Amino acid sequence: NDRSSNKNRGSVLSIYMIVLYGSMALGMFFLNFNSPLNFEPFILVSLFMSISLIPILLTKRKAPTFKKITGMSLKELYDISPLGMVGSLLYGTTQSALFSLLAVYAASMNFSIFEISIVTFLLAISGAVAQWPIGMLSDSFDRRLVIIYSTFGAALFGLFAILAGGQMYLPGELATTKNWFYISVVLFSFCSLPMFAIIFAHTNDFIPKEKFVAAGAGLQFAFGLGAMGGPFLCSIFMDLVGNNGYFIFLIFFHCAIGFFAIHRMKVRKTKDNPDSQFTPLPQTITPLGIELSPITEHIDEPYSEKVQKMLKRKGVAFRKKETEIPENTENLKDK
C-alpha cells in the first residue's frame, strides 16, 4: 500500500496473492509423501515456516513509514466502504469453506488421495494465475463491476461443477470423465480467488493513506469473522442437502456479494481516481498556465545563480521565498 497508488493497487495486491496461492498449490502435493496421521508432515510445515522468515530478516528495504497513523472503528470503515466490509465478511465465509471442505467433498465423491491433491492443486494454482489479469482489469475499470462479474462467474461455474460431478456417476456411456469436473473447479477458482484483493483495493480507493493500516485490520477482522463460521455452516448445509450442498453454499454467498455490489453501484456513483491529474490544457501554454496546471508542483528550493540569470534573460519572473527580500519586479512587468 505504501508504494502503490489507486492506479496500480489491484495489480500490486495481485502479485502478493499469486505468491500466496502458488505456494498453497505446491503444498497440496505433500499429502502424497506421508500419511497425515503421522507427525512428519507437521515437522515439515514448521520447517517451511522457519525458512520463510529468512528473506524478511535479510532484506535491506525499510518498512513503510507513515507520517501519521490514525485508527478507524469498524463503523467508520463501514460508512466509508460498505462493500468492503460486507464483501470481506461474506468472502471470508466462502473461502474458508472452499479450502476446508474441498477435500471432504472430493472424498465423498470417491476421489483417491492423489486425485484430491490434484483438485486442491488446480484450485490454488488457478487462483494464483487469475490474480494478475483480474487485478489489471480492476485498475482499468470500476472495481465493483469486476467484483460483480467475478462473483456471478464463480456462481455459474460452481453450477457447472455440480452438473459435472453428477455426470461422472451416470450409467454406461452417459458417464463423463473427471476432467470436466477439474475444468469446472479451475474456472470457478479463476473467478473466485482474486476477490479479496479487489475488495481490499476498492476499499483503499476511498481511504486516506494514514488510515491504510487501520482499514486493512478492519477488513481482515471482517474476513476472519466470516472464516470462523464458513466451514461450520457449510458442513451443516451438506448434511441437510447432500454432497452438492458444498457448491450450493458457495454459489449462494457469491451471489450475495454480487447483488450487494449491484446495490452499492446504485447508491454510490463511480469515484474519480484521486491519483489522476489530467487537466485539459492547450498545446502552447504561458508561464501562468503552467502555474495553474495541477501536475506542476511548487519548489521551495531557490534556483541556482546560473538558472536565475537564464530566466532573467528570457524575461521570466519568479517568486522568492518569504524569508528573502522581495525583488522589485516592475521592470519585469514592463517586459
Each PLM stretch: what is its role?
Residues L145-F160, I251:
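Structural signature of the two symmetry-related core transmembrane helices
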Residues S35, A130-D142, M238-D239:
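Helix-to-loop junctions at the C-terminal end of transmembrane segments
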Residues N1-S4, L193-I207:
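Intracellular juxtamembrane helix-capping segments at the cytosolic ends
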Residues G153-E173:
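C-terminal ends and interior cores of transmembrane alpha-helices
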